[in-house]
From Swiss-Prot:
UniProt xrefs under InterPro entries: ConA-like_dom_sf, Fructan_Metab_Enzymes, Glyco_hydro_32, Glyco_hydro_32_AS, Glyco_hydro_32_C, Glyco_hydro_32_N, Glyco_hydro_beta-prop_sf
Any one GO molecular function term: beta-fructofuranosidase activity
Protein name, entry field: Beta-fructofuranosidase, cell wall isozyme
Subcellular localization: Secreted, Cell wall
Glycosylation sites: 190, 341
Major enzyme class: hydrolase
Protein's organism: Zea mays
Inducers of expression: By wounding and bacterial infection.
Pfam families: Glyco_hydro_32C, Glyco_hydro_32N
Family: Belongs to the glycosyl hydrolase 32 family.
């Protein structure tokens, strides 16, 4: 246990970083899509890894494929992040748990892979899982192992630190006398749809963990209980399930503080409200509900039963999947991590030598209404801010735009406050377009019809990011206000990358979500993190979040520009805008 398996060769960059770290010390997506089938290809040489559109400050290894974030935790002064990684190429396959450590969740140093096939329970794969801090302060990892060839037969495996005194947790062992700790053999469980154990929580003398599964088309979170964290027994019923949702990948379950309270809670702490999240294999999006937990019955009850179906909320309305939270005891917050896959082609990924990034870590908490979560980039990312430029009280007339100059905007953090300017005696709703209720459950489709170039009443207004000087290439992040059937404003937030690149063979979907915000004052805010091939945006203080991958061919590096635009019929004032260049952190040796 804990030794590197034959055939897993540590790349030179990792060796160097281990030495550097020694001196300093003195991932859902498990379905094997045919387009992502792993090949028996050698590792990609660093010499052909293309830096052109590699992110500057988002998490990624120097090369090859990554997907789900796994088992984030804080231990003895270090943040740990494990993640699904292919050491042999830029496509899915050959998965091991790569391992990086950080003091601040922004600057990362890579260690050797922590978990890899080494016992019968995981001989054919080590898929996603979670970490739990036990009562004595020792971390434990539960993850999904594949123990049979060709059929992806899934079992749950326990791993423990070989040396709990090591703050870097470099070696892990898997006690064969206990593993696998859970199998699909009993209870009529589909053995190929049984994965991704959660962080466990303790209640009434027993540990509980969830494992994602499906029965027919009903997705569910199965409950397992244990007294000693080694021998687990399946409960008679799931914590929760929902019809027609398909397989629940990467479930997550945690308590939240009261409405408006930003302090996070440890997973075993009692909470008045709980969040249950599932990554739906059918849609490849992350959904959550807020509700209550009955610890005696091990049942979860969403506050809004329709939240399992038509009124489902998403962490992010863009390219964001297989997310995982953890409680950060240092900052007393709950932190959300997620995976953003590429949306170019597999040949493109092979050519550039890398695929997949992680979103900037986000702090999440319950909003004052208690009906949704708010998300915001962790404050540590602001340490990367460099040269800044500001714009104040700038009027943008209908059909106009202006450029934000003075900094390099291909790697930037932009915060902007908009204020709608109405003529005396004119209300916001008079100018707003009527909302078609056919789009009530499909903001993304509405954005596809009412994109950034479709002139409207109140909006679209927002940012053109990663734009070329001639605007042939541009990605729009914007708001548009409608008037619903009850005479109330309905706010759409959208990222429209349909003109983001002149390159062919790119997947360029619009992404959108409705913003549950009071815009009667005419004011709304937007923050966008721009990083070469990714745009992460946060509307109305984190009520709606959208991550999009884009691949400009002209608006690259110093040739990328930033604009504010208004394609509505109402004047818009930029009451305040600040944009910062973002520096590159220490990133796994890249």
């Amino acid at each position: 246990m804990g030794t590197r398996p034959r055939g897993v060769v540590l790349a030179p960059w990792a060796v160097v970083l281990v030495l550097v770290l020694a001196l300093r010390l003195a991932g859902a997506s498990h379905v094997i899509h045919r387009s992502l089938e792993a090949e028996a290809a050698p590792s990609v040489p660093a010499s052909i890894v293309s830096p052109l559109l590699r992110t500057g400050y988002h998490f990624q290894p120097p090369m090859n494929w990554i997907n789900d974030p796994n088992a984030p935790l804080y231990y003895k002064g270090w943040y740990h992040l494990f993640y699904q990684y292919n050491p042999k190429g830029a496509v899915w396959g050959n998965i091991v748990w790569a391992h990086s450590v950080s003091r601040d969740l922004i600057n990362w140093v890579a260690l050797e892979p922590a978990i890899y096939p080494s016992i019968p329970s995981d001989k054919y794969g080590c898929w996603s899982g979670s970490a739990t801090i036990l009562e004595d302060g020792t971390p434990a990892i539960l993850y999904t192992g594949i123990d049979r060839a060709d059929i992806n037969y899934q079992v749950q495996v326990l791993a423990l630190p070989k040396d709990a005194s090591d703050p870097l947790l470099r070696e892990w062992e898997k006690p064969e006398e206990y593993n696998p700790v859970a199998t699909p053999a009993a209870g009529g469980i589909n053995a190929t749809q049984f994965r991704d154990p959660t962080t466990a929580w303790r209640h009434a003398g027993h540990w509980r963990m969830l494992v994602g599964s499906v029965r027919g088309a009903r997705g569910m979170a199965l409950v397992y209980r244990s007294r000693d964290f080694r021998k687990w027994t399946k409960a008679k019923h799931p914590l929760h399930s929902a019809a027609l949702t398909g397989m629940w990948e990467c479930p997550d379950f945690f308590p939240v503080s009261g409405p408006g309270l930003q302090a996070g809670l440890d997973t075993s702490a009692p909470g008045t409200k709980y969040v249950l999240k599932s990554s739906l294999d059918l849609t490849r999006y992350d959904y959550y509900t807020i509700g209550s937990y009955d610890g005696g019955k091990d049942r979860y009850y969403p506050d809004d039963p329709a939240g399992d179906y038509h009124h489902r909320r998403r962490y992010d309305y863009g390219n964001y999947y297989a997310s995982k939270t953890f409680y950060d005891p240092v900052e007393r917050r709950r932190v959300l991590l997620g995976w953003a896959n590429e949306s170019d082609s597999v040949p493109d990924d092979k050519a550039k030598g890398w695929a997949g990034i992680h979103a900037i870590p986000r702090k999440i908490w319950l909003d004052p209404t208690g009906k949704q979560l708010l998300q915001w980039p962790i404050h540590e990312v602001e340490k990367l801010r460099g040269k800044a430029v500001s714009v104040d009280a700038k009027l943008v007339k209908p059909g106009d735009h202006f450029e934000v100059t003075g900094i390099a905007t291909y790697q930037a953090d932009v915060e902007v406050s908009f204020e709608l300017e109405l003529e005396a005696g004119t209300s916001l709703l008079e100018k707003a377009e009527a909302f078609d209720p056919a789009y009530d459950d499909d903001a993304q489709k509405l954005c596809g019809v009412k994109g950034a170039d479709a002139r409207g009443g109140v909006g679209p207004f927002g940012l053109w990011v990663l734009a070329s000087a001639d605007l042939q290439e541009r990605t729009a992040v914007f708001f548009r206000v409608f008037r619903d059937g009850h005479g109330k404003p309905k706010v759409l937030m959208c990222t429209d990358p349909t003109k983001s690149s002149l390159s062919p063979d790119l997947y360029k979907p619009t992404f959108a979500g409705f913003v549950d915000a009071d815009i009667s004052s005419g004011k709304i805010t937007l923050r966008s993190l721009i990083d070469r091939s990714v745009v992460e945006s946060f509307g109305a203080g984190g009520k709606t979040c959208i991550l999009s991958r884009v691949y400009p061919s002209i608006a690259v590096g110093k040739d990328a520009h930033l604009y504010v635009f208004n394609n509505g019929e109402v004047d818009v004032t930029v009451s305040g805008l600040t944009a910062w260049e973002m520096k590159k952190p220490l990133m796994n040796g890249a």
